[in-house]
Every structure is written in structure tokens, then in C-alpha cells.
Amino acid sequence: MKARRTVAAALSVLALTAVAACGKDGSPNTDTAKSGSAAPQLPTYQVNADAKLDGSPVWTEAKKNGKLRIGAKSDQPFLGFEDVQTGKRNGFDIEIAKMIAADLGFSADQIEFKTINSSARETSLSGGQVDYYVGTYSINDNRKKTIDFAGPYYIAGQSLLVNKDNSEITGPESTKGKSVCTVTGSTSVTNIKTYGANVTEFESYSLCVEKLLTKEVDAVTTDDAILKGYAAKNQGKLKVVGNTFSQEKYGVGLKKGDAVLQQAITDALKKHEQNGDWKKAYDATLGLSGADAPSIPDLTEKAAG
């Protein structure tokens, strides 16, 4: 919990730097961010040309097509963001997706990122629209009824985003009767309802933030790292309040029953955590504030049986 609070607090420093490092649409401009000699650099990933996953139908089909389809978010600064002008993706989750892809034998130009809303993640995996999903995807037992996970690769905590002049909401206990916005299908919905909040749901966090800025809702709730990205993007207008009130373990989602692919993704995560790529990816995205990287969680998700 201490590590998560430290990361969340330190990310507020981005409010001083993110605006200068953002493009016209508010997306993090990694070229600008890395212009200084001491700026952290994104890692590079060597493609495993000898990768072979016998027994994985998902990998076999992807290899046959020469393309890996990865589900991701597109509206989360410093996590999963798509520049609407260039189509380029950046953020910590995007780097996690790329390092896994390299170990599976796919180069960056063989990746097709697909924006999948939270409410459609399970169906997109089960239906084969994407090969795996990386996008602040919390591991829970209900989701594991229909899909599998590898990981976790990161641990976050739920918090609240409010307007800068809001002094009434200081934490989840003060949301009773208040209008709180979050994303359809996210674990945040269930968590905040226990405090008596009136929940409004949209398909993306950016829509929730728009409603917050126009004061059509009183707060936005989701994981602290996501909220700090939006606070930085909207410098001087929004703030994150209170301590985290949940533990969210981010995992890589994949089609249920593909144990070979699940193990391969687990092995890739372990490798890149141990060789320093995970830390480099964090430092060049969420860690741009200078905050120390949080502890890397144990990889607990394994194939059944």
C-alpha cells in the first residue's frame, strides 16, 4: 500500500511537466520528454525469431497471419494512449504488450493494437477479436470464469478524481449521494457503490473526465495511476483525493484454455522483470515524475490443473 501511495503522490509532479510534454490533444509526447540527456529511455526488445508455441491455437493463427492483435486502452495518459493525429500508441501497458510480443516472435510492426472498451474485454478475447489484452485489466474470479490471465504485472489502488475547488469529497466515505462516474464493466463500479454513491457509467474514462470538468458529475473513480494521468493532463483543474481503497492487480487477459500461451506470456513477463526492461518501461512512462518504481508483484496466475 505504501508503494502504491508513493507512486500515486509522486505522479502529481507530472502536472508541472506533462503539459509541456504533451501534444495538442494532451497525449504524452515521449520525444519531448526524452530530449534531456538524463531523461529515461524506453527499452528495446529483441524479437525471438525461434519462438514456437506448439499447442497454442491463438499463437498458431497469429503466426500464420503474420500479425498479433493486442487489445488495449487508448485514452489513459502514461498507461495506454493513442495519439489521434499519428496513430502511435504509448504508455506503460503498451510497453508490457510489446515486450511480450517480442518474446512470442512478433516485431513491433507486426502488432495491430485494437482499442477495446472495458465492457467488451471478455467477449473480444473469447470471440477471438484480439489475441491478448493489456490495459489496466484487474484480475478477479468473476472474469476468470470466461477468460484466463497471466500476471499480475502491476498493482494499483482505486481512488477519486474531483475538481480542484471541490472540498466536499475527501475519500470514498464522502461520496454517499454524490454523482460518481466510472467505466462500464470495471471493478470500480462495485467498489464505489458500497459507499452509497450514485454511479454514472460510460464506455471510456475520457468521457467521465469531460463530465467532471463540466461539473455534470461530482467525481471520477478508478485506479490511482489512471487518475493521476488525467490530473496531470488537466493541470490546475483536477485533483486526486483520499487514500486508495482497493487493491487492483493488473493482468494480461487471454482466451480461456490456451495454457501454452498463458505460460509463454508468464515466462515473458518474468524475463523482462528480471532483465530490467519492466523498470525501464516504468521509468519512461509512469515514472516520469521521478518516483521510484513500485515492487514488482509475484506472477501468481497459472493454468488450471
Map each language-model feature to its residues.
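Short loop->beta-strand "edge-of-pocket" segments that line small-molecule binding or catalytic clefts
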Residues: L68-A72, N90, P172-G185
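Periplasmic-binding protein-like
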Residues: I155-V162, K228-L269, G290-G305
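Extended ligand-binding regions for polar small-molecule ligands
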Residues: G23, S35-L53, V252-G290
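Acidic, polar ligand-binding/catalytic clefts
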Residues: D109-S174
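Extracytoplasmic small-molecule ligand-binding "clamshell" domains
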Residues: D31-Y132
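Short helix-initiation/N-cap motifs at beta->coil->alpha
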Residues: I111-T123, S167, T184-S186, T200-E210, ...
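Bacterial lipoprotein signal-peptidase II cleavage site
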Residues: A18-A33
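A ligand-binding cleft/hinge motif common to bilobed small-molecule-binding domains
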Residues: Y137-K145, T194, D218-Q247
